[in-house]
Amino acid sequence: MRLQLRSFSTSLRRANNVSQQLKDLPSVSGGGPFPLLPQFQPIGTPPSLVSVSLPASSTLFARRGSIVSINGQLDTITSRLSSLSAFARTVQGMPFLYNRISATAPATLLVSTNTSYQSSLAIVSLDGRTDWTVAQRDALFAWAGAALHVQPNTSLFGSARGGTTRWGNTYLTGRGDVALVGRGQIFKIDLSEDEDILVHPANLLAYTTSQGSANPHGQFVKLNHSAPLLQLPKLPFIERLLANNSLLKSYLDSDFHRAVQNTNKSIRKTWAKWFGTGNQLLQIQGPRTILIQSQRTDLREIVSRNDLAKVGSSD
């Protein structure tokens, strides 16, 4: 037997050069009456790195183990482990350990997603006029800004009135930059005032919120499924038998039949509570901006069991 060898030609794709991003150091301090805010710049297609331009006297919060490279004077940079609402985020299964990086001199850092799944990054810039809600538990990746407030949900078992549950949400207010990590690629949708959209909750990464609106977090709806229409042949004998069957009529009017229906509804509700039904959608009204991820997370990670039961058992 002759052994046949096939030759494979390989080509090296040109790597992204990040030298310039590392060399660009901010020249204005992050303190004083007119501070320079840290700047986030995504790198890659889709972005998997973020270049952070850190002015002097400023602070960066980044997920633990995400730092790839640092350009700056080593003796002017300090890093220590910090927790973000450890109890509330632990109960909800959310990451709570972050590196708090401070610099007394200008520095530039590269941070990576460092995830076991295919992911990409999106940068959200807050100017103090628009707030954001992060809908995924593990989407908060890095943030910077002295006037930026990152507030995890502390209502552990409650839901937003008339809308989605706040289980696992994180609220962003103030001024600063935030890096979010999503599964797959991240896309942006802009809705005008008279527009609305249906989004699967497992694909919803983040969205702008307006506290003055009637329903700032959207509302759950159920996608209706029509039963298949079967054309059966007419059987007069069977039709007369069923029409004149007093036993069948008595069964349909009995308490036992109603008990069977209630049991069936209870089973559907329990199944939806623990496993979901796959047809829950979130109706979001404009005006607002939405970030969606191309790959889904487990629906039970972002929606409470009570909300799953309510939507799954509805007709």
Swiss-Prot record:
Q: Which keywords does UniProt give here?
A: Mitochondrion, Transit peptide
| InterPro entries with a match to the protein in the record | AIM24, AIM24_sf, Trp_RNA-bd_attenuator-like_dom
Where does the transit peptide lie?
Answer: 1-101
Gene Ontology, cellular component aspect: mitochondrial inner membrane
Q: Which GO terms describe its biological process?
A: inner mitochondrial membrane organization
UniProt subcellular location: Mitochondrion
Q: Which SUPFAM superfamilies match?
A: TRAP-like
Q: Which family does it belong to?
A: Belongs to the AIM24 family.
User: What protein name is recorded for this chain?
Assistant: Altered inheritance of mitochondria protein 24, mitochondrial
- Recorded source organism is Yarrowia lipolytica (strain CLIB 122 / E 150)
The coding gene here is AIM24
